[in-house]
Amino acid sequence: MSTFHIETSIGSTDPAVVIAALHNHELMIKTLCPALVSYAFESGDKATSAVYTVTDKKPIGQTTFKLTLTNTPGGVDSLVNAKPPVGILTIAATWRVADGKLTEDVVIDGNFMMKKVAKGNVEKTHPEQHTKLLEAARA
């Protein structure tokens, strides 16, 4: 397993506003998947915990995966269950707002190749996703 910790200052933004943005599943999906092709609600309750099928564009084709978003008092938990051609990939993250920061703790599990690809993607895109999410929360 690979783990990562990412944090971004929320500045003067009210923490409740940032938490509300995290609880907005449509906003989270659009923020987490910048190359989003489509998504569909599968099951659960969008106000608490829901499963979505997400299709994302990749450099070569598209990938479809299950995304579970679970609202918590301080943020949201996300769980990606993907089945790419070369194995299974699970990305679990906790997004929390506390002490003037948006923090994300990520755990990636899969075979060596999938972990390496996912790790590079998380390191490259997630700080940018924090910024976009905070911009949307402030809008």
Feature map (PLM): residue ranges:
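Hydrophobic-cavity lipid-handling domains and compact docking modules
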Residues: 38-39, 43-91, 95-97
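Residues that form generic nucleotide/phosphate-binding pockets
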Residues: 21, 125, 136
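Short, low-complexity, polar/charged sequence segments that are solvent-exposed and flexible
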Residues: 25-29, 40, 71-75, 99, ...
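Beta-strand/loop substructures that line and gate deep hydrophobic ligand-binding cavities in soluble
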Residues: 77-128
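Short, highly charged C-terminal tails/helix-capping segments
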Residues: 131-139
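Intrinsically disordered, low-complexity acidic/polar segments
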Residues: 17, 61, 111-115
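A very general structural signal that marks isolated residues within well-ordered alpha-helical segments
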Residues: 23-24, 110, 135
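Hydrophobic ligand-binding cavity/cleft-lining segments
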Residues: 1-49
